[in-house]
Amino acid sequence: MSSTATTKGGRGKPKASKSVSRSSKAGLQFPVGRIARFLKAGKYAERVGAGAPVYLSAVLEYLAAEVLELAGNAARDNKNNRIVPRHIQLAVRNDEELSKLLGSVTIANGGVLPNIHQTLLPKKVGKGKGEIGSASQEF
């Protein structure tokens, strides 16, 4: 028998193995090949290393997962099953690091964070025992 057992009768080319994407090799969901193409076409540098698009894909995937998790929590808090831009806005602005990263970003249809300044809130009227003998304004 010949060493090429994959071909019929030793004739023809051996079967080519199935191609594996760089995203699946790196265990990522974001497209490494597309990001590599964008890096090359964007003229950020004359040459782009082999690891750069993989690393950038991993960073983008992590950031997207972080925002989606927080936005999903915000949607669940509002008793919604669907994430809308308002939930993304609430998620980003309530997280200190993401708010700093996306500080100059405007999210369309995101609205604003609910905030009432402390001086505008009504004064608390206490009905406790300590206020009976209070002499703060007496002379």
UniProtKB/Swiss-Prot annotation:
Matching PROSITE patterns: HISTONE_H2A
CDD domains linked: HFD_H2A
Keyword Nucleotide-binding in record: no
Coiled-coil region(s): none
PTM annotation (Phosphoserine): residues: 136
Ranges where the record places region Disordered: 1-24
Main localization (coarse): nucleus
Recorded superkingdom: Eukaryota
Post-translational modification (record): Phosphorylated on Ser-136 (to form gamma-H2AX) in response to DNA double strand breaks (DSBs) generated by exogenous genotoxic agents and by stalled replication forks, and may also occur during meiotic recombination events. Phosphorylation can extend up to several thousand nucleosomes from the actual site of the DSB and may mark the surrounding chromatin for recruitment of proteins required for DNA damage signaling and repair. Widespread phosphorylation may also serve to amplify the damage signal or aid repair of persistent lesions.
MF-aspect GO terms: DNA binding; protein heterodimerization activity; structural constituent of chromatin
Motif ([ST]-Q motif): 136-137
Cited Gene3D superfamilies: Histone, subunit A
Keywords: Chromosome, DNA-binding, Nucleosome core, Nucleus, Phosphoprotein
Cellular component per GO, a single term: nucleosome
Intracellular or extracellular location(s): Nucleus; Chromosome
Quaternary structure and partners: The nucleosome is a histone octamer containing two molecules each of H2A, H2B, H3 and H4 assembled in one H3-H4 heterotetramer and two H2A-H2B heterodimers. The octamer wraps approximately 147 bp of DNA. Interacts with numerous proteins required for DNA damage signaling and repair when phosphorylated on Ser-136.
Family indicated by similarity: Belongs to the histone H2A family.
PANTHER family attached to this UniProt entry: HISTONE H2A (PTHR23430)
Biological role: Variant histone H2A which replaces conventional H2A in a subset of nucleosomes. Nucleosomes wrap and compact DNA into chromatin, limiting DNA accessibility to the cellular machineries which require DNA as a template. Histones thereby play a central role in transcription regulation, DNA repair, DNA replication and chromosomal stability. DNA accessibility is regulated via a complex set of post-translational modifications of histones, also called histone code, and nucleosome remodeling.
Notes on the domains: The [ST]-Q motif constitutes a recognition sequence for kinases from the PI3/PI4-kinase family.
Protein name: Histone H2AX
